[in-house]
Amino acid sequence: MPRITVALIFGGRSTEHEISIISAKSIAANISAERYKVIPLYITHQGTWLCEGIARDILNLDLSALLRNSSPEAAAMALDRMVEEAEQKPFNLDFRAIGIEVAFLTLHGTYGEDGRIQGFLDTCNIPYTGCGVLASALTMDKALTKLCVADAGIAVAPSITLLSAEYHADTEKVHSRIEEKFIYPFFVKPANLGSSIGISKVHHREQLPAALKSACSLDSKIVVEKAITGREIEVAVLGNDEPEVSVCGEIEPGSDFYDYHDKYIHNSAKLFIPARIPDEMQSEVRSIALKAYKALGCRGMSRIDFFVDEKRGTIVLNEVNTIPGFTDISMFPRLMAASGHSFPELAERLLQLALETLRP
């Protein structure tokens, strides 16, 4: 039986570029070589597509160690230097010419998780892993996600949405609007970034200007959100028409909240699978996750995050990630493993779910 040719697409123009490479490396190691021929396609920070040669070299880097021992900026410079020294011609994006039959997407964040690459691949009639255009775009925007799931009867944290232009036009007015709505502490978040990039927990007025400046420098829209107390609970959802929900996992942050450095550099958070909440609450979380998955029109996969306060009995949806991380410390593959899907089985299932969506 001939092997199916898979384009493993990674890198990209987002601030999560390096995490995307680490995810792709994990996926490459777990796709069956007997059933699939993997062609790595690397997108540089500047948006240039590179195939095979340099793409494979970058895939083999130990970026996890580089991030731990230096900084995201140093890692980005090292990658750009590799590309420059390779002097490889860009890939011409003719997927059919090299026999690509399906794409495995490990692009995190802007330009990869927000519906843009999905729309491009739909135009090329190339099936791909994960959600389609609409669900990808919708879940990328934290403000729109809240509106959609709240309409389905799912609890979300109280929030307001601001435009960066409003902040730059009248900073004091924005400060006043926020303080009229919330008591400290609260969160300031870019609306369209992942991996907790640009998120600040603001404990007092002196921290507010820097938090807003940081978020506004990264996105044209920001979300200011009430700080919810409770355990951080995550579930993985896998499937198209008949999705399955994993066991619940729990994250105990090593810092004030589970931010980028806690996730990928310090690695100080503690993970618990199953989560340390009563069985009946786990069942309710899983039920709400499935409801959200369907309300948002998801397919393929998503990781859905909650805040759970067992004393009050409250379950609040935090966010939905349509291309979750596949690194060694990522919750999605761990949750699926705890639910009976080994990493190779998970990679196989995701590719099969992608192929199911192929239109004649």
UniProtKB/Swiss-Prot annotation:
GO terms for cellular component: cytosol. It is found in: Cytoplasm. InterPro entries: ATP-grasp (IPR011761), ATP_grasp_subdomain_1 (IPR013815), D-Ala_lig_Van_CS (IPR000291), D_ala_D_ala (IPR005905), Dala_Dala_lig_C (IPR011095), Dala_Dala_lig_N (IPR011127), PreATP-grasp_dom_sf (IPR016185). Keywords: ATP-binding, Cell shape, Cell wall biogenesis/degradation, Cytoplasm, Ligase, Magnesium, Manganese, Metal-binding, Nucleotide-binding, Peptidoglycan synthesis. Binds 2 magnesium or manganese ions per subunit. The keyword Cytoplasm applies. Its main location: cytoplasm. It catalyses: 2 D-alanine + ATP = D-alanyl-D-alanine + ADP + phosphate + H(+). Mg(2+) 1 binds at residues 305, 319. Mg(2+) 2 binds at residues 319, 321. Its EC number is 6.3.2.4. ATP binds at residues 179-234. This is D-alanine--D-alanine ligase. It comes from Pelodictyon phaeoclathratiforme (strain DSM 5477 / BU-1). The lineage of its organism: Bacteria, Pseudomonadati, Chlorobiota, Chlorobiia, Chlorobiales.
